[in-house]
């Protein structure tokens, strides 16, 4: 029997296109592909300017890493960039199957571990139980707290969100083929529409995923057409990211409440959705269903994975009353890879099946 195969060289590829080296992680089942090397410089004086530059000039990097054959329609990614904020340890641009997210909680939880393990933050004191990682996301600065032993991460990570607020409650939206549906719209670094799956004739815990995706996508498109999203800080943040279908259990309870998030181009989050948990906590606090520092558990109907969240203090976002939300979850490493492009590959920039 032949021994293990060793490959000391890269496969044939376009010498003018550097290999894209990545570390893969997941948080509650939701993937995160972190670019280590091979991405051209992302130019811009601010993080939001860098986001615009990448969309306009480097979108082939996103497509190559997120799309098939190197990824899949539910792949998620992160490109690390310098931040203009003095307190930030790193800046990040989030990649999805449609474009560029403003916030991603599952990615922040993973990046907290990654930043500590890969030496992107100062080494914590030898007796420290947690390391602070300040991550500049497109929505703002997010503080992640990473359980550690020396310079290595261990256990769960938690983060404190940007100010989260409610944009609308009980908004009546006409969903084609499904009638009039009442939704809430809240912001947790990204805007989501929230609706109980029961109002759409579905059980979020047992319905077929295709049915949940179709229903959530219909709500998203209807809200986009019938409600004007605005954000007090930047028009770059003023868009509906997706719809979160819930089990309707918004009143405080020690038992987990279940939801599923469908975002971008019908992309399904395998985790409970960190920015969605943030927005849902803000919504429950706004409605008087939750007090400060009351912890709720949120379960993904896709994988059963659980995040916890709580409102830790009140804040403001423009004229909106807001809260800072703490979200906790566990991220894991899954591997490393180097992706290449051959110059005669007609599918070099990837494709998606729908």
Swiss-Prot record:
- Chain's gene name: L3HYPDH
Q: What does this protein do?
A: Catalyzes the dehydration of trans-3-hydroxy-L-proline to Delta(1)-pyrroline-2-carboxylate (Pyr2C).
The entry's substrate-binding residues are: 105-106, 269, 274-275
Catalytic positions are 104 (proton acceptor)
Q: Which GO terms describe its molecular function?
A: hydro-lyase activity; trans-L-3-hydroxyproline dehydratase activity
Q: What else is known?
A: In contrast to the T.cruzi proline racemase enzyme, lacks the conserved Cys at position 273 which is replaced by a Thr residue, transforming the racemase activity into dehydratase activity.
Cited Pfam families? Pro_racemase
* Name of protein: Trans-L-3-hydroxyproline dehydratase
Give the UniProt keywords, A-Z. Lyase
Q: Does the keyword Lyase apply?
A: yes
